[in-house]
Amino acid sequence: MRKSSMGPDTEGTQRMLLNNEFVFQYGPLDQGWWPDGLYTAPTYEAMVFDIIKTKEMGFNMIRKHIKVEPATWYYECDKRGILVWQDMPSGDLGNQWEPNLGQMGGTEKDRSPESEAMYRKEWNKIMDDLHNFPSIVVWTPFNEAWGQFKTKEIAEWTKKKDPSRLVNSASGGNHVITGDIVDLHHYPDPKMPRPDLFGPTHAVVLGEFGGLGLPVSGHNWLEKNNWGYQSFKTADELFDKYSSFMNTIEGLIKKGLSAAVYTQTTDVENETNGLMTYDRKVIKVPVEKLKQVTDQFYKKSLVELKR
């Protein structure tokens, strides 16, 4: 039904491919939280609403962030043509995080035998349970060093278990050169891993950026102490900054970027950096405007593959 692979462009930078063609993958960080049920959507229709609005906003991918959804969620992504990056929910603590590519300082977690066994059991079960959903194109075993351990071994095991999908070994670090993808987190403005250093062997992606905040009175979890990586008072101000980021992303695509993830789909409790409010009653910028500034990402003329 689909092939997820990599191949070089004419500059020798590895690109993420879909059915042997380069398709820039752009999606929101989606934590799947709800103000009443937390990890449980109030209705099936509410769950599907998020997917529909995501596509209407111009995204073609969702990074399902440190959560596993019901099988029906993945079915709806299959049906609606939305790609999925699936995170392993983070567990355990105690690592030192080094988010900067090429710098030392990050540490691998020395997990207890019980913790390591539980991780392997749960990650194995997640991959087994979700294997038959073609929308999933990327597995992400670790995020921002949280509980990260034996990175090379885990990435290689993940790839051996499921060679049909790409492996993003550590989204945002700690960075170990393994798997298929090198993933940088950078807030608020978009940056990318250096394609001259990492591109010959790995796809380079921006695993998180943005986080532009706009509290909407009457729809906040907390009326005070809300935050975004950069906050605004009006929707027009937010959109102007978002639009400028989209122009930057287009330039990065030409230089070697294969994918980007914007933080985030909805507000989550005191995080008011969603494109929708936590209760989903307010879409902060009209979906038509958001789509208009992302359509440019999908032009085939941006990238030429080596044939």
Short names for language-model regions:
Residues 1-54, 288, 295-304:
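N-terminal carbohydrate-binding accessory modules
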Residues 49-53, 61-293, 302-306:
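Substrate-binding/catalytic cleft of secreted carbohydrate-active enzymes
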